[in-house]
Each structure stands twice: as structure tokens, then as C-alpha cells.
């Protein structure tokens, strides 16, 4: 019998490199064949077979052709070929079925009619598709990994037919067997064993699967031990508790409408006005029943609000799928799936799309430092510590009770870098804020002296993490030049936002945690005591240009008993709000990009609660309306005046005018644009007004009032200030001319120079 009449396979040649087979497959006769697959059937029955293409589908055995099918629980199986009569397969053991040569059949593509206790199901046999699992060298490139790993919709051509389905690939090098389970096979691990391929990858193509199908992987450990069902590490969509199943999803379906945004010119982000609104999607607002807004509802309400308030970007706390809502997303399991708490991946794309069409950028918090120990996730994925170091001194984070990614392994680095690139490409995001960078950089982070392992040079720097962060930044900026990466890094590690070719980590920006800590520490003091802490508020300017900084008042400052930003302020209600307004004015006048957590703009009085929406009812009160109006005007002032932002990251954009007036707790400085425009900013951190305050300035001209945080429209005292003031030839602060100003209590005022 000619082997060219079948798509035969030799069972000894398919373990890792399944050979090609003929397109035109014909069955001429069925012959009696010997049963050589008892052991294979035993392993299939235990969902422990790693080489299913050696025993299932059409192949040649001792010169004889046969078609074997493994269908546990089936009563009867028949072969269906277009234009040919049905052919019944004979039973071959408890769950196996075999076709013996009895008649001529032209078999380039076939289906199976399976009888399940009287209910017939037509199945396209996955084990006839053996030549689509090839060429994995491209998986060494992070940009390509997510185009292949996980579940992808593909279309094959067989016998003139287009066969659509889903190709599954998963990395589990130490597993002894992997099966695909899901609603399509009643979660039966015996039904769809996956093929062990090269590079530790397992694969299987399931014809006919559509979007919205739940699935997981059933793995056997290195010694054959059963493991918990695992979510797809590359899964694009997943269910919530209790199943946590992955869901098939096709990224090609969504039709983006943000071409204008995506095609905008590449700009230098350091020179732009960047004002981030940090947001937790589950607690910004709730619907009338107290339930979450979905991504589309959130877009409909949030986007016009951001535009009106003058923010340039929304920064979302992690949306990667996370099983525990109370982690706020910082314990992610599904790094490639936007959480389904708020809708589908298409819904999240709609959210990003709506932001872009309105001119709002989208930044995501990204968590590459650690991952939780949930059974369905990455923890001991293939029965071994595949993604973390087995030594708890390097692989376990004591503060967060989570595993630390082992960045010394190439597959872990690729997995994470691929994930960062994925969000930019597939969801059109504009930036990532990398969480907990300090915990990655230092081997002894939050550890006692005997709980960490030094690097090869005996030091505490994590060389693998440093290399990974550099690589991630290089890849992001190479493929997405308009992107930005931001580090949450709380130490003095040098060059966080310096380019990698200059020895830096390559981030675009770094949160200024020192400014946040020192400035909040200062404003918490009663005004009468602030003069004793004057150095605290001025010290951040010593290092203000050592990195490309973002001044951040993030969610971390309004949780765990810290109270709200508003309630950190001393005094009675009026003084608290006045202090808050003066502080916000001071923040916007400082060099650095701006970030405020949601609720700050309305003067939220309660600590943030992720189980409830913000205190929007506060806007019934004038003083909270005033805070909101002020934040709106500060954002627009910051964006509209080049002096306020285009030299944020260089020393030339800032000059002190008054630094040492500790007794009066008054600070004054000028912001300077590239074109030489100047804005004078003066903050009075006491409730004492000044009728005639003289301040030396280097330029002659007229200063026009731009904004006064004590204005009555913001809820201020409405102490009368000069809307226009001209320099006088009166020496002050060693300068030949000066201004005589009226300074309101607890206020920040902005004046623009007109020469």
C-alpha cells in the first residue's frame, strides 16, 4: 500500500518535530492492524500522555494505515468525509476507536460524528492537524511572543476548505503531560492531550472553537503528579471567582477609532505638560445600585470630566486580571488580560479609544516585581518554581506574601518584557508606571541581614532586575517612540530616568517620593511651627533636576490610616481647605510633572475606600466646589503656560527668589520657559496676610496676576491682591529692582512677567 495515499505519520518521528504529510489523503482499504498502543491508551486514560500525535489521528504502523480516535465516554464514532458515506470506527479499548481499511475514502480533511448517549456531536478531529506547530525561534523576540503564545485564532486550508479554530501554546518545560480542558470537553483532561514540542512548549489546535470559550490547562508535574488547573499565562480574557478560567478572545475584531491620536508626531515628553489623574476603576463612581461601572460606562462619565478638569492623562491602577479585588490590582495573575470585573477586552479598548478621541492619554500601573501564590496562576506552574527562585531569600516577598519573579531566567524576562509591549500594541496605551521598582533593584529590600543573598560581587544590587528593566525600557521606546515609562522608585538609585546608553535604567520619568514625603511632612505642621521645619520644604529643590520627576500625591498617601490629603492639613475646616489650596498651588508651581489621586480634586475628607465611590456629595458644599475649581484652573494654567512645564526637567527652568524666609514661612521662585517667559510664584504658608511685602526680581517689567488660590471663587478669604504690579527701582534680595505685593493668608499666587 502506498503511504502517499494517506497523511501517514511514523509514530517514532513525531515527538518533537512532526513531519509533513500529503495534502491529498486517501483511504483505499482498511486492513486489520495490530494493537501496539496499549501503553499509549493507559497514559491517555490518565491524562498523562505527552505525545498524542504518535497514537491519534491517521498514521502508518508496520506498513498498515489506520485512523485512531480517543473519545472517553462516547458510545459510537463515525468518520465523515465530504461526499462520502459515513464509516463507523470500531472500538479499540474502553475509550479508543479505530478505523480499519475497508473501502476507498478520499481523506484530505475529515470530521467525526460522535454519539454521546444518544446525542450526536460533529467534531473536527484536532489530531489530523500535526504540521502547524513549527518555528519557535521567533519566540526569542518579546515583541512576537504574545502573537503566538496563549490562545490564537487561526485559519488553515485543508482540501479546499478554510478551517478556523484556536491554536493553544503554553510553556511548561518540566511538565510530564499537559491537557487542554474547557467547556468544550466538559473539563475532561483525557479528551485533549497537548503535544510536547520544542523549547518546553506544548501545543494543540482545536478546530471550530469560537470566541468566549472557557478553558484552562491541566498539567502533570515532573513525576506525573496532578496539579491544580492553571489559567493561561498568556490568556487575553478570564473569568472571575470561582472558576478563574481563561476565555478565548480575538484581538483582531475591535475597530479602533483613534488613528489621529496614534499618528500624532513624536514629541519629547520631558517638555510637555503632563498632569496625571490616578484612578481606581472600581471606586471612582458606582452605579445607582452600588455596582461597578463597566469600562464603557466609565468612559462615558470619566472622559468628559477629565477634559473639563484639564488633566492630560488618566493613570489606571493595575487592570491586569487579579483574583483579590482588595489588592487594588497589585497582585495580578493574568498579566495579559484586562480584569473582567468591568467588562471584556473590547470594552477596555473602547475606554482607551474614547480617551484618545478626547485627547486624553492612558497610563497603566504595571507590576513586574512579584506575583501571588494563587493555585490557578504562575505559582509552581509546571510543578516546579518556573517563574520564581526556589530560595525564599530571593523568591519570596515577606511584605506582600507573594513570589518574586526570577529575572535571572531568560523565559521570565521575555514573559515580562513581552507583556509590557503587549499593552502598548494591543490596547494602544500611552505609558506604564512600573510599581515597586525599589523592591526589584535591591536584594536586601525590606529584609534583615540574614534573609538575603548577595550578588556575585557581594553587594545588594539585583543585577538581573537592573538588566531586565533596561531591556524593557529599550524595547518600549524602540517600538513605541511616543510612549513613556515611569518608575515608582523610592531610593537614591542613580540614573533611574537616564538613558541606558548613559548607564541609566532608561525610564522616561521617576516619581519624586522624596518631594511627596517632605512636602506633606511640612504642611502637616501647624503654621506656627512651620518655621522650624523650613528646610524640609526647600530641600527637595536640591535634587529636583537629578531625575525627570513626577510630583506624585498617589493612592499610597490616602490609605492605611494616613487619612486624606485634605485631612492632613492642620486647623479648623476653613484653614484645612485654605492650606490644601495653598499646597496644591505650591505643587503646581514646582518643577516636575503632576499626579493626583482621584478625590484630591474635590477635597475628599475620608480615607480612600475601594469598596465605595468617592465622596461626590461633598460638591454640595462651596468650599469643596472651590477646591475643584482651583484644581481645574491649575491644570489649565500648567498646560497653557510654557514656563510652567517646558523646562520641568532642567535647572534652567527654575530660579529661587526667596528661599530662606523661614520666620514668615514664605517661599518665592520663578519658572522660566525655553523662550524666556517668566512666572513668579509666591506661597504664604501661614494664616498671616502681608499688606506690603517686598520681593526682589531680576527683570524690569509689569507682573500680571494669573491665579490666586485665596480667591473667593475658590472659597478663599478674598484678601485683595494686586492684579497688576510694576517693578520699582528698590533694591531687595541683592537685586536692583523689586515688587511690592499684597500676600493673602495661606495662599499661592502666580504672576506673569510682561517686559
UniProtKB/Swiss-Prot annotation:
Protein EC: 2.4.1.18
Substrates-to-products reaction catalysed: Transfers a segment of a (1->4)-alpha-D-glucan chain to a primary hydroxy group in a similar glucan chain
TM ranges: none
GO biological process: glycogen biosynthetic process
Protein origin, superkingdom: Bacteria
MF terms (GO), sorted A to Z: 1,4-alpha-glucan branching enzyme activity; cation binding; hydrolase activity, hydrolyzing O-glycosyl compounds
Positions of the catalytic residues: 435, 488
Keyword annotations from UniProtKB, A to Z: Carbohydrate metabolism, Glycogen biosynthesis, Glycogen metabolism, Glycosyltransferase, Transferase
Recorded metabolic or biological pathway in which this protein acts: Glycan biosynthesis; glycogen biosynthesis
InterPro entries linked: A-amylase/branching_C, Branching_enzy, GlgB, GlgB_N, GlgB_N_E_set_prok, Glyco_hydro_13_cat_dom, Glyco_hydro_13_N, Glyco_hydro_b
Pfam families, per database record: Alpha-amylase, Alpha-amylase_C, CBM_48, GlgB_N
GO cellular component: cytosol
Enzyme class: transferase
Family as reported in the entry's similarity comment: Belongs to the glycosyl hydrolase 13 family. GlgB subfamily.
Job of this protein: Catalyzes the formation of the alpha-1,6-glucosidic linkages in glycogen by scission of a 1,4-alpha-linked oligosaccharide from growing alpha-1,4-glucan chains and the subsequent attachment of the oligosaccharide to the alpha-1,6 position.
Oligomer and partners: Monomer.
NCBIfam families, sorted: branching_enzym, PRK05402.1, PRK12313.1
The protein's name in its UniProt record: 1,4-alpha-glucan branching enzyme GlgB
Organism whose genome encodes this protein: Vibrio parahaemolyticus serotype O3:K6 (strain RIMD 2210633)
Gene from which the chain derives: glgB
Amino acid at each position: 500500500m502506498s503511504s502517499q495515499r494517506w497523511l501517514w505519520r511514523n509514530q517514532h518521528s513525531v515527538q518533537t518535530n512532526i513531519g509533513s504529510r500529503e495534502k491529498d489523503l486517501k483511504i483505499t482499504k482498511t486492513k486489520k492492524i495490530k494493537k501496539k498502543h496499549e501503553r499509549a491508551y493507559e497514559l491517555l486514560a490518565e491524562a498523562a500522555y505527552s505525545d498524542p500525535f504518535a497514537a491519534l489521528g491517521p498514521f502508518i504502523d508496520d506498513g498498515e494505515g489506520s485512523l485512531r480516535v480517543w473519545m472517553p465516554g462516547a458510545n459510537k464514532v463515525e468518520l465523515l468525509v465530504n461526499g462520502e458515506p459515513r464509516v463507523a470506527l470500531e472500538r479499540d479499548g474502553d475509550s479508543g476507536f479505530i478505523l480499519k481499511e475497508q473501502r476507498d475514502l478520499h481523506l484530505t480533511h475529515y470530521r467525526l460524528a460522535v454519539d454521546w448517549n444518544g446525542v450526536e456531536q460533529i467534531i473536527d478531529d484536532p489530531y489530523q492537524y500535526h504540521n502547524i506547530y513549527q518555528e519557535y525561534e521567533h519566540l526569542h523576540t518579546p515583541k512576537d511572543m504574545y502573537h503566538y503564545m496563549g490562545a490564537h485564532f487561526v485559519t488553515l486550508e485543508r482540501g479546499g476548505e478554510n478551517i478556523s479554530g484556536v491554536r493553544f501554546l503554553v510553556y511548561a518545560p518540566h511538565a510530564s503531560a499537559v491537557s487542554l480542558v474547557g467547556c468544550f470537553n466538559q473539563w475532561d483532561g483525557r479528551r485533549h492531550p497537548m503535544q510536547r514540542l520544542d523549547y518546553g512548549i506544548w501545543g494543540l489546535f482545536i478546530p471550530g472553537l469560537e470566541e468566549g470559550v472557557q478553558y484552562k490547562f491541566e498539567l502533570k508535574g515532573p513525576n506525573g503528579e496532578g496539579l491544580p488547573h492553571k489559567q493561561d499565562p498568556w490568556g487575553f480574557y478570564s473569568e472571575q471567582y470561582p472558576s478563574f478560567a481563561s476565555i478565548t478572545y480575538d484581538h483582531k475584531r475591535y475597530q479602533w477609532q483613534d488613528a489621529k491620536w496614534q499618528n500624532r508626531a513624536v514629541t519629547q515628553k520631558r517638555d510637555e505638560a503632563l498632569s496625571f489623574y490616578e484612578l481606581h476603576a472600581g471606586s471612582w463612581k458606582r452605579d445607582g445600585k452600588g455596582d461597578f461601572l463597566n469600562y464603557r460606562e466609565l468612559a462615558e462619565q470619566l472622559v468628559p470630566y477629565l477634559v473639563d478638569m484639564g488633566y492630560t492623562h488618566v493613570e489606571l491602577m493595575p487592570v491586569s486580571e487579579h483574583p483579590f479585588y482588595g489588592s487594588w490590582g497589585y497582585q495580578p495573575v493574568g498579566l495579559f488580560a484586562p480584569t473582567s470585573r468591568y467588562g471584556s477586552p473590547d470594552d477596555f479598548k473602547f475606554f482607551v479609544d474614547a480617551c484618545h478621541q478626547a485627547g486624553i492619554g492612558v497610563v497603566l500601573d504595571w507590576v513586574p516585581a512579584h506575583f501571588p501564590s494563587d493555585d490557578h496562576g504562575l505559582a509552581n506552574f509546571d510543578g516546579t518554581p518556573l517563574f520564581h527562585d526556589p530560595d525564599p531569600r530571593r523568591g519570596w516577598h515577606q511584605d506582600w506574601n507573594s513570589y518574586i519573579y526570577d529575572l535571572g531566567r531568560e523565559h521570565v524576562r521575555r514573559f515580562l518584557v513581552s507583556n509590557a509591549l503587549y499593552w502598548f500594541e494591543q490596547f494602544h496605551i500611552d505609558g506604564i508606571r512600573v510599581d515597586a521598582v525599589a523592591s526589584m533593584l535591591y536584594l536586601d529590600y525590606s529584609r534583615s541581614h540574614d534573609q538575603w543573598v548577595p550578588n556575585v560581587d557581594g553587594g545588594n544590587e539585583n543585577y538581573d532586575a537592573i538588566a531586565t528593566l533596561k531591556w524593557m525600557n529599550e524595547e518600549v521606546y524602540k517600538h513605541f517612540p511616543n510612549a513613556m515609562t515611569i518608575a515608582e522608585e523610592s531610593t537614591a538609585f542613580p540614573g533611574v530616568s537616564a538613558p541606558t546608553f548613559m548607564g541609566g535604567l532608561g525610564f522616561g520619568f521617576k516619581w519624586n517620593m522624596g518631594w511627596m514625603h517632605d512636602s506633606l511632612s511640612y504642611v502637616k505642621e501647624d503654621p506656627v511651627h512651620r518655621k522650624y521645619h523650613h528646610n524640609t520644604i526647600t530641600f527637595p529643590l536640591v535634587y529636583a533636576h537629578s531625575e525627570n520627576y513626577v510630583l506624585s500625591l498617589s493612592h499610597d498617601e490616602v490609605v492605611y490610616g494616613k487619612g486624606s490629603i485634605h485631612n492632613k492639613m492642620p486647623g479648623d475646616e476653613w484653614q484645612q481647605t485654605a492650606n490644601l489650596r495653598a499646597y496644591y498651588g505650591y505643587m503646581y508651581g514646582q518643577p516636575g510633572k503632576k499626579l493626583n489621586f482621584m478625590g484630591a480634586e474635590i477635597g475628599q475628607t475620608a480615607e480612600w475606600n475601594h469598596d465605595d465611590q468617592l465622596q461626590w456629595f461633598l460638591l454640595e458644599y462651596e468650599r469643596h466646589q472651590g477646591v475643584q475649581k482651583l484644581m481645574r484652573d491649575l491644570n489649565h494654567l500648567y498646560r497653557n503656560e510654557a514656563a510652567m512645564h517646558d523646562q520641568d526637567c532642567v535647572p534652567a527652568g527654575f530660579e529661587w527668589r526667596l528661599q530662606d524666609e523661614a520666620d514668615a514661612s514664605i517661599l518665592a521662585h520663578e519658572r522660566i520657559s525655553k523662550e524666556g517667559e517668566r512666572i513668579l510664584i509666591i506661597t504664604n504658608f501661614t494664616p498671616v496676610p502681608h499688606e506690603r511685602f517686598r520681593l526682589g526680581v531680576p527683570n524690569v517689567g509689569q507682573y500680571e496676576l494669573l491665579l490666586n488660590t485665596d480667591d473667593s471663587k475658590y472659597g478663599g478669604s478674598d484678601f485683595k491682591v494686586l492684579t497688576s504690579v510694576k517693578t520699582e527701582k528698590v533694591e531687595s534680595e541683592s537685586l536692583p529692582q523689586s515688587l511690592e505685593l499684597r500676600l493673602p493668608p495661606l495662599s499661592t499666587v502666580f504672576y506673569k512677567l510682561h517686559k
